[in-house]
Amino acid sequence: MIQFKDSYKHYGANGREVTALQPLNLEIHAGEVFGIIGHSGAGKSTMLRMINRLEEPSGGHLLINGQDITVLDRMGLRALRRQIGMIFQHFNLLSSYTAGNVAFPLKLTGASDAKINARVAELLAWVGLEAHANTYPAQLSGGQKQRVGIARALATRPQILLCDEVTSALDPQTTTTVLQLLARINRELGLTIVLITHEMDVIRRICDRVAVLDTGRLVETGLVTDVFLHPQHPTTRSFVMETEHIDTSALDQDFSLVNGRIVRLTFIGTDTYLPLLGRVARETGVDYNILSGRIDRIKETPYGQLTVALSGGDPVAAQAAFAAAGIHIEELRA
């Protein structure tokens, strides 16, 4: 649906050229939730805003439904933007009351008052704000403001929804509510959602696939289950470790206090709940010492990770038994 073909972005600054996004080749599929993660300055916002040409690409091609949007004239660009909704980090609401904010993009299309009023009422009910139609933004909580922003973004019935750090200004409980609403939008309305964030936990909870940016370069991309559980690039690994609150120095200290081969076992799906560790220990005579562990979900898929020290018995046979059971093994210390 969305294709970046050698798309890049340069800026002029103080007489020199600065590269915000290096040539990028990537496809975002229709109907998926696609996440873009990176630290500040990685090029996330630039990449997102190129999709609706709030940022003009410096070169390359960017296709939406097969159409190269880099060559659109003003009228074509206006038509494109009606198919793309956008939600902002800091809400960007007008000072008018809630219903007025949602009605604003519809007024720009020239819709009749009757159609506008009906659509606004429908959207406010959909995001759970029907009781706040005549409330001003200053009277709303952060989560309510973001829901107004979501309703406004949906007003013109877009095919694509762009989300610019939509949860970074929210508390954890409100973040969960907003992510659940976005998941419902994707599930029930079939919208393609592209979101940027610096939090791997947001990617884990809502996205189907993810792209990792580092200083303007695409360094890793794939299914969230693959990228999250088996990160390849150092930037990706750092995001995952931040999410799991892993202190590498403390981990090294823990490792120094135990004997044996140290491995990380990753279980996905229903295997997460099977007593495989005990069974393999009995079959191979291996003693195990659990150093850390967690069970969580990537979107709807359960997964578990255990870091264990294996000693005695036959640790090589134990690792082979885990592999035969479909468990991914990462050797941390031989």
Curated annotation (Swiss-Prot):
Q: Which reaction does it catalyse?
A: L-methionine(out) + ATP + H2O = L-methionine(in) + ADP + phosphate + H(+); D-methionine(out) + ATP + H2O = D-methionine(in) + ADP + phosphate + H(+)
- Gene Ontology CC: plasma membrane
Top-tier EC class: translocase
> What topology in the membrane does the UniProt record assign?
Peripheral membrane protein
UniProt: ATP binding residues: G38, H39, S40, G41, A42, G43, K44, S45
* Intracellular or extracellular location(s): Cell inner membrane
Cross-referenced Gene3D superfamilies: 3.30.70.260, P-loop containing nucleotide triphosphate hydrolases
- In short, the EC number is 7.4.2.11
> Which InterPro entries does the UniProt record give?
AAA+_ATPase, ABC_transporter-like_ATP-bd, ABC_transporter-like_CS, ACT-like_dom_sf, MetN_ABC, MetN_ABC_transporter-like, NIL_domain, P-loop_NTPase
Q: Does the keyword Translocase apply?
A: yes
Q: Which UniProt key words apply to this protein?
A: Amino-acid transport, ATP-binding, Cell inner membrane, Cell membrane, Membrane, Nucleotide-binding, Translocase, Transport
Its function, per the record, reads: Part of the ABC transporter complex MetNIQ involved in methionine import. Responsible for energy coupling to the transport system.
Family the entry assigns = Belongs to the ABC transporter superfamily. Methionine importer (TC 3.A.1.24) family.
Instruction: Output this protein's name.
Output: Methionine import ATP-binding protein MetN
Which organism was this protein described from?
Answer: Xylella fastidiosa (strain 9a5c)
